[in-house]
């Protein structure tokens, strides 16, 4: 049995006449089978060229017809074009067509309309059945191991949204990633369509809808803070280029971890300006640490504490603002319904504890990073993603690292953690909050390091100089409830070397460094 493949431009009148004759033959001959292929006029020539190169044929016009032997297999046999097929039909089957040129043109336009309508239906169907493409960078990191079960539980994107996870890392991590793939498949999650690995740089972020950027390992030894800052640039430049080139146009990028989170976020925005508005930094890890410390002090559950605000550098100089923080379901002489809450600062009578011990514990956690392990990082990322897609709890304040546009007097052009709420698939900065003003000295201290990090990383400044204030008391009386966590010590900010990171490709040398800065 032979099958004739008839391919042509959707608006080609000769294809229309060929199709009519082929339909007649298939209807009246038991062993005559046809397969039709139409292409839009603008892509026809490229498609035809690819087919001819693949089969080593020579054909330049529409339509093109070839035979495939279904019972034997093997290479298809080129029959030719419009004239050759009509000649074949007349000689073998004594069938001809008397279709007029005018009718051929009418049918050709109908074919084009039908082709466009079919394409639109297929695209609409794909949006319903295509899974959400989730990419995780540095997938050999511990946080990835803890993040996958949360993503596949359906809690983040919903039980009606299927996901495909791609684990991206270097070639040296491939065996570890293969083991991770097997474990992920063993979860038998109803929302997991597939899980795969990618170690080829040029294939990274193909059609990605969500990209999770985890802490990366360094591939060379660094001895100074300046070198460490500059070492972030090549990888962020590479990721930015690949995101612009390969990812879906509405991709969402979320940066998590404990080292240079704000810097990596602003660098990604610089090198992927097209989607800069969809790049955020996770601050819920620091927020969770603060809630846990407060909960231990108040002898309650961390989940009962709400509205802790993280200002500034997520992995460095930041302030934990407790002025809006409230505790629910607190066991005391005063009880109320579930929605009843009390200000945390009214329940902590020892103000010195807030100013000293609370700050010291936070500083120790930030400096060592030992408590910010895989579980906390994964949960913080997953929760932020959940809020991004489905909205944050009504009335609740969420801390998020985003590009400053001058809100709260923060300098423009730096990534800064500030209070927001999530709604309708995006975030809204809570600029209408009352009594959250921060003094100029404190704001300068927080922003100075972030600005210097960016300048040193980009080579616009040689040395990093920590901010020094001439004021003996940096925290005025009205801001005693801001807990300041100093920047982490440099040696603890350097990620441990595990595998060699993907190197920049040659095409990066020609990459133009577009920025989001005006």
From Swiss-Prot:
SUPFAM superfamilies: LDH C-terminal domain-like, NAD(P)-binding Rossmann-fold domains. One of its GO terms (molecular function) is L-malate dehydrogenase (NAD+) activity. Its EC number is 1.1.1.-. The keyword Oxidoreductase applies. Pfam families: Ldh_1_C. It is an enzyme of class 1 (oxidoreductase). CDD domains: MDH_like. Keywords: NAD, Oxidoreductase, Tricarboxylic acid cycle. GO terms for biological process: malate metabolic process; NADH metabolic process; oxaloacetate metabolic process; tricarboxylic acid cycle. InterPro entries: Lactate/malate_DH_C, Lactate_DH/Glyco_Ohase_4_C, Malate_DH_type2, NAD(P)-bd_dom_sf. Belongs to the LDH/MDH superfamily. MDH type 2 family. This is Putative malate dehydrogenase 1B. It comes from Homo sapiens (Human). The lineage of its organism: Eukaryota, Metazoa, Chordata, Craniata, Vertebrata.
